[in-house]
């Protein structure tokens, strides 16, 4: 009994909770990094054309772009015995596990189900790729919100996001390293099968272990029946009445979609500038990262992905893919180092200098990749992009925290030009029941709108509440509505949408550009050009109060 009590106290310690949460961060990044490395060559090998291959890679980001703001709002208002975040994390994790099963076994499943397996194999492979990309990237939004829920103190917030960035980099290192190993000749091959089956079997084992760690996270519990918002007389429904709750949820879901569109489109100018800068920076970096292994395999090693197994051309391509995986591994290793020293860099040089330096370093690295035919130079350039990767993982989110800590300065309330109708004529309903703004959560946190003032944050992080009350306003003219107080979870979802959107344009257009140019070097040229555009928009970001007057925000 004493031993159990000691273990329970140990697991509920702040550092233990931080490690348990970020184990899932590690697992997600391992799966995504291995997928980014291995999926494009796999699609090319089964006969998907270059332009269609890039479009397949855009399926997950497009779906995520639509669902991330909605999921962020739904998570803020969810109530259940397992908390607000973990049910969404577990549901998305199931999708990832399904994709890890489908991708290496698409041909085997297609052969079992139909006599002509080729079309079904392609369909199952595309389904698996889209599911992995969508669930893996969307899962980061409730995970970031869970960190913000549990680590609200400025010092703890800074530590939480530093560990978060560190675990992303560490997961990327392992995820890029695993495809670089020739598993066909390893000791695991007789037990796990081919290269693909060995790789994805290991990914499944790693991810299951990381998801199991979230069972020990001490998230807030349910508070009981939700109180209706002020001024509302919501009908009371028994908790066991599932059809009633389902009808209510679907009714509010239909009304919430246009409201979310309004919230995202009418975001404050400070956040809009940060969004555009992050979008351009991520677009450049993801164009580089998504197609780097294909560029090395075809461009540097002169391999052919559709060549027969055992031929010289195919062997060169496979060697190039493994060398490309090594370059991306070094990218994550450099990112890991910078995530450890990022706080010191910001304290020494300031957020503006570090952010601009990281964005400016990228086109230099991408340009060197375009111009050089040396494997060593290209690999070193890929490693240099880890600085940009680390900065984009940390600084935009901590700037968003700064905006919310001083929301009266950086996030002014917006009101329409015309006068509104009386409150009696409007009906407001919550999407899902949740605690009132300012009401304490069971773990002692205070919701958005609480009266407590937080102390000044350290260099990287400002604490803020992570719950946002997104209410659907029915029966009131659009111009009379007041944009509700924004919570950080919605704005984190918007920043995550920039990351997802940054993969859509490259996925849609890069394949056609490469086919027109007849050279995979077009991948790197496009990345360098987007990096130059990102430098301009990075100079327009609001880093402190002096920028508000400078940019007339």
UniProtKB/Swiss-Prot annotation:
Keywords: Membrane, Symport, Transmembrane, Transmembrane helix, Transport
Catalytic activity: sucrose(out) + H(+)(out) = sucrose(in) + H(+)(in)
Sequence intervals crossing the membrane: 19-39, 52-72, 88-108, 120-140, 161-181, 198-218, 275-295, 323-343, 353-373, 382-402, 522-542
InterPro entries per UniProt: MFS, MFS_trans_sf
Broad class of the protein's primary localization: membrane
GO biological process per UniProt: sucrose transport
Signal peptide limits: none
Classification via Pfam families: MFS_1
Membrane-topology descriptor: Multi-pass membrane protein
Gene3D superfamilies: MFS general substrate transporter like domains
Localisation per UniProt entry: Membrane
Cellular component, GO, one term: membrane
GO molecular function terms attached to this record: sucrose:proton symporter activity
Similarity comment: Belongs to the glycoside-pentoside-hexuronide (GPH) cation symporter transporter (TC 2.A.2) family.
Function: Proton-associated sucrose transporter. May be able to transport also glucose and fructose.
Protein name per the record: Solute carrier family 45 member 3
């Amino acid at each position: 009994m004493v031993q159990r009590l000691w273990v329970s106290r140990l697991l509920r310690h702040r550092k233990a909770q931080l490690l348990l949460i970020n184990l899932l961060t590690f697992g997600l990044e391992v799966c995504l990094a291995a997928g980014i490395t291995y999926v494009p060559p796999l699609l090319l090998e089964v006969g998907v054309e270059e332009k269609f291959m890039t479009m397949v890679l855009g399926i997950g980001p497009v779906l995520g772009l639509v669902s991330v703001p909605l999921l962020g709002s739904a998570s803020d208002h969810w109530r259940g015995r397992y908390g607000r975040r973990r049910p969404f994390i577990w549901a998305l994790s199931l999708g990832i596990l399904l994709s890890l099963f489908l991708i290496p076994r698409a041909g085997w499943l297609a052969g079992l189900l139909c006599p002509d397996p080729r079309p079904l194999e392609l369909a199952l492979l595309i389904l698996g790729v889209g599911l992995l990309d969508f669930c893996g990237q969307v899962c980061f939004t409730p995970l970031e919100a869970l960190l913000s829920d549990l680590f609200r103190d400025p010092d703890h917030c800074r530590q939480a996001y530093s560990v978060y960035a560190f675990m992303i980099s560490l997961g990327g290192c392992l995820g890029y390293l695993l495809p670089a190993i020739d598993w066909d000749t390893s000791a695991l091959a007789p037990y796990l099968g081919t290269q693909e089956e060995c790789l994805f079997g290991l990914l499944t084992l790693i991810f299951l272990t990381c998801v199991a760690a979230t069972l020990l996270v001490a998230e807030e519990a349910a508070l009981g029946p939700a109180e209706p918002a002020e001024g509302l007389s919501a009908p009371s429904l028994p908790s066991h009445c599932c059809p009633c709750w389902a009808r209510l949820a679907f009714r509010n879901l239909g009304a919430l979609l246009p409201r979310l569109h309004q919230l995202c489109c009418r975001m404050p100018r400070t956040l809009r500038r940060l969004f555009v800068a992050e979008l351009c920076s991520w677009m450049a970096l993801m164009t580089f990262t998504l197609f780097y292994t294909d560029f090395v395999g075809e461009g540097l090693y002169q391999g052919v992905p559709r060549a027969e197994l055992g031929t010289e051309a195919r062997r060169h391509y496979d060697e190039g893919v493994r060398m490309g995986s090594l370059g991306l591994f070094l990218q994550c290793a450099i990112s890991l180092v910078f995530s450890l020293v990022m706080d010191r860099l910001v304290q020494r040089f300031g957020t503006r200098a570090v952010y601009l330096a990281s964005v400016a370093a990228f086109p230099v690295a991408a340009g060197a990749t375009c111009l050089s035919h040396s494997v060593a130079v290209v690999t070193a350039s890929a490693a240099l992009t880890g600085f940009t990767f680390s900065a984009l993982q940390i600084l935009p989110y901590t700037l968003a925290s700064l905006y919310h800590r001083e929301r009266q300065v950086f996030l002014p309330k917006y009101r329409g030009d015309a006068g509104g109708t009386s409150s009696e004529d409007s009906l407001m309903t919550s999407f899902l029941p949740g605690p009132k703004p300012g009401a304490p959560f069971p773990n002692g946190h205070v919701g958005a709108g609480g009266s407590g003032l937080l102390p000044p944050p350290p260099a990287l992080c400002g604490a803020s509440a992570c719950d946002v009350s997104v209410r659907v306003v029915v029966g009131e003219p659009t111009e009379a509505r007041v944009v509700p107080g924004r919570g950080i979870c919605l704005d984190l979802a918007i920043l995550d949408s920039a990351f997802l959107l940054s993969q859509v344009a490259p996925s849609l257009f890069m394949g056609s550009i490469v086919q027109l140019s007849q050279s995979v070097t077009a991948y790197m040229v496009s990345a360098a050009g987007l990096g130059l555009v990102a430098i301009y928009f990075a100079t327009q970001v609001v880093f402190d109060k002096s920028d508000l007057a400078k940019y007339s925000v």
